[in-house]
Regions:
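Structured catalytic-domain cores with a bias toward divalent-metal coordination
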Residues: 1-217
């Protein structure tokens, strides 16, 4: 199998880019039997930061505006980026709306890689509101694009059960099948669905900086 893992296409959602390095290290260094078997039977493509300019802009903001002693208050300047923020690329365009149009160099390179490898699964790692939990697809079924096959959605649900089981075993809050959708094919989690692959969106509650208080702690 070929698995394409894409991280932080929105630059101010940095947990994906940060975790991608840990993922690469874990895959390279682990002697775990499961990981060795996985690597023997899979090709894993890691796109550690799909929006490097946005991530750099975000990092510059939070590192310049953080307190010497970390302050988790949401009103702190660190968590309130000035426009244009780190979500967009160098040209201030949302790259997660450019998968179909492919007008930007990051998108063109990414789609070229996608077409070269034709991955079975593409993961798209994002962040959402600080007071949320964790989301993984499938999304709202009534907002799935009509050209997306039933087989695609059935496999997405099957993969979701695997995630749910592991979240339950670790007492981690999550939700699935609501709020987010699979309609517009210009996004990283849906572009694969019309191109013979399975796109999976992951959304993690964001700190939007170094540390931020939330209703969950």
């Amino acid at each position: 199998s070929v698995i394409y893992q894409g991280f932080s296409i929105h630059g101010n959602e940095p947990s994906g880019a940060n975790s991608s390095i840990l993922l690469a290290y874990y895959l390279a260094a682990s002697n775990d039997k499961f990981i060795i078997e996985l690597l023997n039977n899979s090709i894993i493509l890691i796109d550690p930061c799909m929006n490097p300019d946005g991530l750099q802009r975000f990092a510059s903001w939070v590192n310049s505006n953080k307190s010497k002693t970390p302050n988790g208050n949401s009103y702190d300047r660190e968590f309130n980026e000035a426009w244009p923020r780190g979500r967009t690329n160098h040209y201030w365009f949302d790259l997660n709306r450019d998968w179909l149009a492919a007008q930007h160099p990051e998108s063109q390179a990414r789609i070229k890689t996608f077409n070269k490898w034709i991955p079975h699964i593409l993961t798209d790692h994002h962040e959402m509101e600080t007071n949320s939990t964790f989301f993984f697809q499938p999304g709202v079924q009534s907002r799935t694009h009509p050209l997306t096959s039933k087989a695609n959605q059935d496999l997405t649900k099957k993969i979701a059960k695997y995630h749910a089981k592991n979240f339950d075993n670790n007492d981690v809050l999550y939700f699935s099948g609501e709020r987010f959708d699979d309609f517009f094919y210009g996004k990283g989690s849906t572009f694969p669905d019309i191109n013979g692959s399975i796109g999976i969106l992951f959304e993690q509650a964001s700190s939007r900086g170094h540390i931020q208080n939330s209703v969950n702690g």
